Amino acid sequence: GRGLLPFVLLALGIXAPWAVEGAENALKGGACPPRKIVQCLRYEKPKCTSDWQCPDKKKCCRDTCAIKCLNPVAITNPVKVKPGKCPVVYGQCMMLNPPNHCKTDSQCLGDLKCCKSMCGKVCLTPVKA
């Protein structure tokens, strides 16, 4: 029935058109802190759309279920590429211009690599090269 449509849209990543990665228009130093990729049951209204709406050094970043002002983390060696290869992605994203949750491997915790996923770039466990 019609009651299933919002769930289907959420599953396809369409329900949050405002979900733009804060780093795209960022001019403040540092990077948004890494976040756990978990399924959100209820998205909160965005608290900001750009870094300049945030006080002091805070950046406008995606959090688990919202976009809000968070303290930046230092970009430790942005050119370092971690070992391993990104897993092969099958399928096509239904969302136009999906947000990237990382840009470089150094923004990912531990051994995780910044890889292309079905919808945007995310931190993933690499496969052996």
Swiss-Prot record:
Record-linked CDD domains: WAP (cd00199)
Residue stretches in coiled coil: none
Disulfide linkage: C32-C61, C40-C65, C48-C60, C54-C69, C86-C115, C93-C119, C102-C114, C108-C123
Region (Elastase inhibitory domain): 81-129
Protein name according to UniProt: Antileukoproteinase
Function: Acid-stable proteinase inhibitor with strong affinities for trypsin, chymotrypsin, elastase, and cathepsin G. Modulates the inflammatory and immune responses after bacterial infection, and after infection by the intracellular parasite L.major. Down-regulates responses to bacterial lipopolysaccharide (LPS). Plays a role in regulating the activation of NF-kappa-B and inflammatory responses. Has antimicrobial activity against mycobacteria, but not against salmonella. Contributes to normal resistance against infection by M.tuberculosis. Required for normal resistance to infection by L.major.
PANTHER family: ANTILEUKOPROTEINASE (PTHR19441:SF44), WHEY ACDIC PROTEIN WAP (PTHR19441)
